[in-house]
Structures are given as C-alpha cells and as structure tokens.
Amino acid sequence: MTVRTRIAPSPTGDPHVGTAYVALFNLCFARQHGGQFILRIEDTDQARSTAESEQDILTALRWLGLNWDEGPDVGGPHGPYRQSERKHMYGQYAEDLVTAGHAFYCFRTPEELDAIREERKAQGLNPGIKGDLELPEEEVKRRLDAGDPYVIRMKVPDEGVCEIQDMLRGTIEIDWAQVDCQILLKSDGMPTYHLANVVDDHLMGITHVLRGEEWINSAPKHKLLYQYFGWDMPELCHLPLLRNPDKSKLSKRKNPTSINFYERMGFLPEAVTNYLGRMGWSMPDEREKFTLDEMIENFDIQRVSLGGPVFDVEKLRWLNGQWIREELSDEQFMARMQQWWFNQDDLKALVPHIKGRAEVFSDVAPMAQFMFSGMLNLKPEDFAHNKLDESQVKRVLQFALWKLEAQRHWSKNTIFADIKALAKAMDLKMGDFMFSIFVAIAGTPNSWSVMDSMALLGPDMTRSRLRHALEVMGGFSKKETKKVEKEYAALGV
C-alpha cells in the first residue's frame, strides 16, 4: 500500500499557521513512509472562497518548503483538485444514499428546525438536528414533483456508541445520540464538507487522515458514510490544536496567525517550519533546531504529544535568531536580507507614495522606515491628543481592530470605508479619529496616507500594530472588555 496523505484548506482568508502545521505533519508522515502528499482545495463555501486566498495559501506553503505531489497547480491523476470543479459528482453519491435508505430528503423550513432544536433542548437532549425530520414517501414525492426546495440529510442511529480508532488516542467512544442528521447536499446542489470530504478522500486514495482534534466530533459521521458507501475508511489521527501562551485556542485576536505576517516580519521560512515541527513533536535527541529533511528522516507520529502545543511568537523569534547566527554566513545573511528588504513587488508598491515627498535619497529611509519594521517603539504619550482622552483613544484603537479583523477584502478603499463608518458611528471627526491610527501604524501623526500604508502592510501586520498600540495604552481589563464589546455592538457598524 502506498501511503497517501492530504491537506485540504478552505480558501476563505489568510493562510493560517494551523494549516501549515497540519500540512507539515501530513508531509512528514507521507515522506517517512515513501508515500505521496496531496493538496486539495475545499471551496464548497462559494460565498467566502476567493481565488486570491487560494493563491495566498499555495504561495505560503511553498515559501515554507511544503511541496505537494498532486494539487490544483501541479495536476495529477485524481483531479480536479478543487471541490467546486468536482460539484457534478457529489449529487449522485447523495442520491445513491437516499436510494439505499441511508439518507433522506428534508423539506423542513428554518423555523421548523428551530422549533425542533428548542424542543430537544427542553428535553435535555443534544440540540443537534434529529428526530421528526422525515416525511411519508407519498408526501416526499408530492413535494419533489412540486419543485419544493430540499436538502439531503444522512440517517444516524438514535442510540448506541460509535467507536473511532485514532492513531494517537486509541479508541474514542461517542454516543450516537450526540450526532445529528448531517446535511450532505445543500439546496443549491453543493455538497457540505462532510460528504465532499469523504467522497474525495476515497476517490483520491487517501490512506491516512491527519487533521486537527476539532474534527473528532465529526468522525462518527464520516465513519458512517464510509460504511454506507461500502468503502474502507482511512486511518485517522487527530492532532492537538495550537494554543496561545495563555492556553486558549490560537486565534488572530491574540496572536498573528497568518503565514504572510511572519514572511513580512523577516522570519526565515526554515525557522518557521522548524518551529511548527516542534508543536507537539520532538526529535529523538530532543534538539530544538532541525531542518525539514531531518524532521522527515526522524518522523514518528507516536512522538506527538497530546498536550496543547503553545505557539509563542517570542520563542519563534529566539529560534529564528539561532538560525540566522548558526546557519547563515555573512554572505548568505546579506543575500537573504536584500531579498527581504528590497523585494521588488513591495518596493514597486511603495515608491509612488514616497517619491513625491523625497528631495534626496536620504529622505527615503525616515519616510519608509515604519514599512520595514515589526512592532514600533511606542509610548503612551505618543497618543496624547487635545480632543481625545485616554479612554477614547483606546476605544478608537480597539474598535478599529475589531472592525478590520472582520474585513475579508483588504484594500485601501475597503479600509477607508470601515474607518469612515467607525468615525461617523462614534461621532468623531475623521481627523481626530485618524490621529491614533496614524501613530499606531506609522509611529507618528505626520506620515503619508495611512490608508495606503495599511493596504501595503497587509491585514496581519496592521492588526498586530493596532493590538500593540492598545497594549501600550494599557488595554482593557476583562470586565472593561465586556462593556466595550457592548458599546461596539451598539454602534451597528
């Protein structure tokens, strides 16, 4: 048997370090066993999926050295490798399950489903969708003939226990009563993740599925689908989730999570990959610094620890420093620095904003310095403003951060629209509102267009600087945060 693993990201945002972490372990497992590593794009969420996000994911993973054998950009014998391009095949599989009695047409309205949830909740049951969902055969035929909208749901046992075999955790038991009748095919004909995932893994010959532990509760549905189809199920391995230093689930609200951020900060890809390799796994000799090839050579999935691995940016900085000092000659250091500092695409985007302000080349460094920095050296007094008190400044920074965290289409125009709407909702003049934003992003209120700066810096660096500025100003306590969250919600922006 040829071992085949896969990573299947959704192109709905910035390339996440969690995606890279899971991709790395899948790659190492496949290579260790002389197998193949596949990349598949799971873009069934057409409303949120973008081509730009897909390209960002591919570029980021390649930057880290995580190369795949088959995928949407390199092709392969099991293509296409985008689920949106495989849409035509999922419907028949769902219909086959209906014919076999393993799934059913569901015509329930959202209101009816809400009522079912409330009834189950009142009975102390799991509020997932189960119970009185199926209609008599004659009624189903009448509804289908009338063209009523429907979804296809899988049938799930009402009682008993589902046993899942996990490569790290052994036998996992989940009560069937906790598993809902999952939608397999949506009313628009698109499959849900669960159907597409199982069908694609089977058709692509995936033998081992290494994924995050957040998918454990979905494993019974997947096991049931494999049984319904009469297919062999891949071996499962649920990896521990990455954590913030405070042990909470890794999130962009507390840590930069985009791979793009670390590239922009000037981290070495080898160091980032090395650090991700230490997330819950260790070399047999416990050394901290190792190459991807060394990790592959020594990889043993049983060395993965189930304790939540902590993604600590300061620890990553330390490791990156070790790589710089121990692995790069002066010439290599200079070449890498030039590659990062004089990135042609970045410079091309930056020049129009500084050329008109410069009289001699030595003017450029002070004007552009903040574009090539990490977190700026800020002090609370930098935010002193004659019209805004400290409380207002902190709210400007926090509200801007929350608003921009929700922005999926990052550009000067979308940023401006968000900022303008916030300033209006807070009843602040644009100039007064922007003062704190200028200082947070550029380190001074006297800089060239901060909207352009944020567009060029990108979402993760922009958010990180706003978060850093808020910390410099003292931030909010947990109690204050709840109050401020209510204020933000009341703005309606």
UniProtKB/Swiss-Prot annotation:
Recorded protein name is Glutamate--tRNA ligase
Q: What keywords sit in the KW lines?
A: Aminoacyl-tRNA synthetase, ATP-binding, Cytoplasm, Ligase, Nucleotide-binding, Protein biosynthesis
| NCBIfam families in UniProt | gltX_bact
For the motif 'KMSKS' region, what are the positions? 249-253
One GO molecular-function annotation for this sequence? glutamate-tRNA ligase activity
Q: Where in the cell is it found?
A: Cytoplasm
Q: Which family does it belong to?
A: Belongs to the class-I aminoacyl-tRNA synthetase family. Glutamate--tRNA ligase type 1 subfamily.
Q: Which Pfam families match?
A: Anticodon_2, tRNA-synt_1c
Q: Does the keyword NAD apply?
A: no
Which Gene Ontology biological process is one annotated for this entry? glutamyl-tRNA aminoacylation
Instruction: Report which superkingdom the organism of origin falls in.
Output: Bacteria
Provide the function of this protein.
Answer: Catalyzes the attachment of glutamate to tRNA(Glu) in a two-step reaction: glutamate is first activated by ATP to form Glu-AMP and then transferred to the acceptor end of tRNA(Glu).
Q: What reaction does this catalyse?
A: tRNA(Glu) + L-glutamate + ATP = L-glutamyl-tRNA(Glu) + AMP + diphosphate
Q: What InterPro entries does the database record attribute to this sequence?
A: aa-tRNA-synth_I_cd-bd, aa-tRNA-synth_I_codon-bd_sub2, aa-tRNA-synth_I_CS, aa_tRNA-synth_I_cd-bd_sf, Glu-tRNA-ligase_bac/mito, Glu/Gln-tRNA-synth, Glu/Gln-tRNA-synth_Ib_cat-dom, GluQ/Sye
Q: Where is this motif: 'HIGH' region?
A: 9-19
The main place the protein resides is cytoplasm
Q: Which gene encodes it?
A: gltX
